[in-house]
Amino acid sequence: MNRRRRYTGSNPSLRRVLYRAHLGVALVAVFTAGLAVTLVGLLTLRAYADPNQQLIARSISYTVEAAVVFGDAQAAEESLALIASSEEVSSAIVYDRQGQTLASWHRESTGPLHLLEQQLAHWLLSAPTEQPILHDGQKIGSVEVKGSGGSLLRFLLTGFAGMVLCLLLTALGAFYLSRRLVRGIVGPLDQLAKVAHTVRRERDFEKRVPEAGIAELSQLGEDFNALLDELESWQARLQDENASLAHQAHHDSLTSLPNRAFFEGRLSRALRDANEHREQLAVLFIDSDRFKEINDRLGHAAGDTVLVNIAMRIRGQLRESDLVARLGGDEFAVLLAPLASGADALRIADNIIASMQAPIRLSDGSTVSTSLTIGIALYPEHADTPAALLHDADMAMYIAKRQARGSRRLAELNDPRILQEEKEIDSATPEAPPK
């Protein structure tokens, strides 16, 4: 038969799975949104960078026009530096009519981010912008302006910092919302798991799952509680049936008295207790006189009524600690434990015999009388085992029945007369003695 796979603890819990899922979704969403915004921003900056670079080149061409006309390199450099230093320009060069460099300006490479700015400008900005310098409609030179990646780098760094901050805030928000959601989902599931574990380990079918705040989980809890109701009812019926079967296995169905197996087990325990506490006990072997005659003459129903009444009358003469059992047919056995003396056993036997003096009323209104013959064996005087005690009490009962029906007899240890009569009984025919 396939064994059910058990949880080993290596799998992640539902709580952790939900936390990871919520955090992952939130981070992916923020990262995707941040990346999209950054790309759109870069494209927008690039779209504005080209016209701005052309405006800067045109402004420089107007400013250095006079210096180019007169070939004044110093004035051209001063004008060039004045404009380029305040704009997003990495370099600017002024050429004369012959294409020779008249003036140039380059932004100083300060800081570790200069190379990164150059790389961004190379990747994202267009080629350097060239603007002719005109005088009276004639080209007298040109200006070459190369853009700087400083703005792009600042934008990227600001966007990255903002995205990291958003990711942190999103992670905190996702953790908080996940805890609330997990509390609503995992909490009821934990309760259900605890109840199921308690029911499985302790067989406590009275446990119930509390109502959840989510409809589906609440329905699951109701179905689980309904299942527990059925299991509790089934368990109760099973216990009742087991108790009934156990009672039937150890009790006589007619008289409801314990049977021979139950009596012998109880006698064995009583002997151990008596030996441990040095106490005395007695076994009474009881047989109904002329029961076969009553059963044959009046029928089995009358015989059953007689047996039930005998059981009730014997039980009525005993203490709560004593035990009476039906061994079979019309034979009964009584365990008297503890016992103060053998005289108490004789007195109880006399009371049982006396209880049978009143006639037994049958179902048809008629009455019938019977008597009981009792054999008594004492522990430890006569025997110290269950079988030996029952045997000695049985032998004493048969001897008493031969001598006088409706009497009682105490087994006697090593009594020659008892031994002789016991031999006669053992050698007699299998037919039971008259009752």
UniProtKB/Swiss-Prot annotation:
Changing residue 66 to V: No longer binds to YfiR. CDD domains: GGDEF (cd01949), HAMP (cd06225). It is found in: Cell inner membrane. GO terms for molecular function: diguanylate cyclase activity; GTP binding; metal ion binding. The active site is at residue 330. Residues 413-435 are annotated as: Disordered. Binds 1 Mg(2+) ion per monomer. Pathway: Purine metabolism; 3',5'-cyclic di-GMP biosynthesis. Its main location: membrane. It comes from the Bacteria. Activity is tightly controlled by YfiR, a small periplasmic protein, and the OmpA/Pal-like outer-membrane lipoprotein YfiB. Diguanylate cyclase activity is inhibited by the specific interaction of YfiR with the TpbB periplasmic domain and is activated by YfiB, which releases the YfiR-mediated repression through sequestration of YfiR to the outer membrane. Residues 279-415 form the GGDEF domain. Residues 413-426 have a biased composition (Basic and acidic residues). It catalyses: 2 GTP = 3',3'-c-di-GMP + 2 diphosphate. Homodimer. Interacts with YfiR. This is Diguanylate cyclase TpbB.
